[in-house]
Amino acid sequence: TAASKDDSYLPNTNEVVPLIHLNPGVFEVSGIRGYSDSWKNIGIWLTKLMEGRDQLLPEDVNSLKALTAQYPTPREKAKAVYELLRNTTRYVNISLGIGGLRPEKASDVKARGFGDCKALSNYMCAMLKALDIPCDYAVISTEHKNVLHDFASLGQFNHAIMRVTLPGDTIWLECTDPTLPFGYIHDGIAGHEALIVDGENSHIVRLPMPKHETQKREYKYYVEFTTDGCGYSHIEENYSENYFEKNRTLKEITRQETQDNIREKTGLSTALVVDFKYVENLSNQNVCSYIYTIFAPKFCKQSEKRMYIPTNLFKTDISKYTDYQ
């Protein structure tokens, strides 16, 4: 049969076609035996595999305590440590030996300044544990939201993150992207199920989804036009939550890229960028704004004595956001 066409609203292929899943009931890696008859036992095996790898040198623990001494609450301390992680490490994929399953030692990540998702998440956990802040290492899939609850297998995960559990507050941390704000649950894991790796207490949990009312894409623009159809437009694009995540790259683009982007979105092929700036507000909710002024020689269409003024400059941009509706 012919391959199905890509459609934003279709369910994942694995959910609609027949599949056969195979997995060993008993396995052994690096001398550690595991059982795949339950997610709890998978978590127990991962806990044993990671045993002793979340230790830091005494001098590093003392440095952490000195760094966070000024912050009165565990949340503020955790945020300061997350900033430290962002500023002193970088993501490098390491899959040698059993590196695809077991993270590097936290002390090695501290010394080298890099690691993969497992290593960076484990390192972050190690730093928080050194400050007596409760946290857990977790594995998750960035491709599938749901795990097979009656078929436990490590192959269902491809990523590692971590969870901070405070009284009345649960914080999920992505440790591989230094641009993401503290506690931001990005689109690759939002609403996905994860395995909390905590020995006998290992279990499946689901990460929260952003609230619909906080996901906004807003355009504001003020236009001045002349009798010959030329127009100046001051435009403000505001994005929050998933839209914020998708549009953060706007802060890195050049004037020429900005001009090309605006021409594509508005359909104004002759638009020229007069000025532009990118602004972020991460204090209360994750919001970014892109503010610019354009000049378009053919802003309005003319026909004899009539002038046709576009009332929605961004109508051509709607289809790009179907996955976020």
Task: Walk through the language-model features, giving the residues of each.
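A sensor for short, sequence-defined functional sites
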Residues: 1-325
